[in-house]
Amino acid sequence: MGQRMNEENQKQDQKDEIAGKQEEPGQIVSEKVEKKREEKPKKKRLRIQGAAWRRLDNTAKLFAAVSGEDLSSVFRISAVLKEKVDPELLQRALVRTLPEFENFRVKLRKGFFWYYFETNNRNPGVEEEQSAPCRFIDPHRGARFPFRVSYYGCRINFEVFHGLTDGLGALRFASRLTEHYLELVKKLPVMVQEREFSPLREDDYLRHYRKLPHRHYNSRPAIAIQGEFLPFDQMAVLQGTIEVSALKTECRKVGVSITKYLAAVLLWAIIQTETDGKTLKRPVALNLPVNLRNFFESETLANFFAVVNISWAAGKAPEALEEVIASVGRQMDEQIVKERLEETISYNVSNEKKWYVRAIPLFVKHLAMQMIFLHSTRAHTMTFSNIGRMDVREELRDQVESFQLLV
C-alpha cells in the first residue's frame, strides 16, 4: 500500500515538474520544434517495407505478370488425416497459424511500375472444396489473400499463389496449420516453436546478387506431351504412392539420390511413350526447381529458388534406364552447385536492376514478361519438383495418413 502511494506521488511530482517547465515561454517553443522534428520520421516509417507494404521478390514479379485463369501459378499441399475434418476447428487453426507467418497477411496490388503486396487486415476463411484444385486466385476480387484453405472429407488443402512463397514456405505453413488443427481436435496445449525463418525479409535474390558473366536459359524447344485436351473447367490429377523404404532400396542399387532417380525414371518414361524409342527429334527436358537456401544464407519465407534444365538431347534415344540415370546424375552434379546458381541469380536480377527496365510502366512489362515466359516454357517437357520431407511433430504423427503435393 505504501509503495503504491509512493509511486503515485512520484508520478504527480513528474507531472508538476512538466507543468513547471511549461511556464517558461522560451522552452515551450523549443519543445514544440523538437516535437515537430520527431514527428516527421514517424510519418515516413509508416511506408517502410514490411509495415504496410513490401515489394515482390524477383521471381514473384514474373508470376504476378503471367498468371490468370488459364495459368493460375497456384500449387497445393494437402494433409490427409485419419478422421473427417471439422470446419470450425480448421477455421480456428487458420486464425491461430496466420500470425506466425506475417508475410502471408497480404493482398496483391498493382502499382504504376511494379506489383506490390499490401497488408491485409481481414481474417481469411476456410471453404469446402467443390471445384478443381489449384484454381486461379484473383487478387482483384475483394481483398483476397493470395492463398486458399479448403477441406474435403479427411483432407486439409493449402493452396497458395507462387508469387507469395515457394515450396518451403508453403510446406512450413501447411505443417503448422495441420499441427494447430490437431491440437484443437485433441485439446492439446499450443506448442510455440522458435522461428526458423524470418517472415519479413523480402528478397534474398537481391541480397545475394553479384554482377557476374551469366548464362542464358536454354530456349531450344523440347518435346511436348501429346494427348487429348480437357475442357477449360476440368483437370485430371493422377496420384501414386510408394513406400519410401522400397524407393531408397532402388536408389542405393544405382548409387543416386531419390531426386536423381525419380528425374531419370520420368525422363525415361517420357522417351518411351512420346517417341519411337530410337530417335529423338527434340530433347526431352525437365524443369527442376532448386532450393537456394541449401547454398546461400537465407531466412526468407518469400521465393528463393532457381530452376535447372535436366534433359536428354535430341538424336539417339537411350537404350536403357541406366544410361539416363548416369546422364541425369552428371547434369545435376554440374548444374546444382553454388557457382552455377550464382550465375542464374545474376542473370535474373540483372534485368530487373537496369534503369530503363525500372522506368517502363507495368502494362508494358506485363506484356514483355508474358512473351518471355511463354517462350521459355517451350524449353521443357515437364516440371518435376521435390520439396522434401513433409511432417508434423512426433506426438501428432499418428493422426496423419499422408501429405500430398500438387503443382
Region locations from a protein language model:
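Acyl-thioester-dependent acyl-group transfer interface
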Residues: 2-8, 21-115, 121-148, 239, ...
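Non-catalytic, low-complexity flexible loops and terminal extensions
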Residues: 26, 30-58, 164-172, 176-249
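Short acidic-rich active-site patches of cyclic nucleotide enzymes
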Residues: 76, 154-155
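Acyl activation and transfer enzymes in specialized metabolism, enriched
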Residues: 82-100, 159-175, 239-276
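Residue-level signal for tight coil/turn positions that link beta-strands
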Residues: 112, 153-154
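Short hydrophobic beta-strand segments that form the core of ligand-binding sensory/regulatory domains
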Residues: 157-159, 309
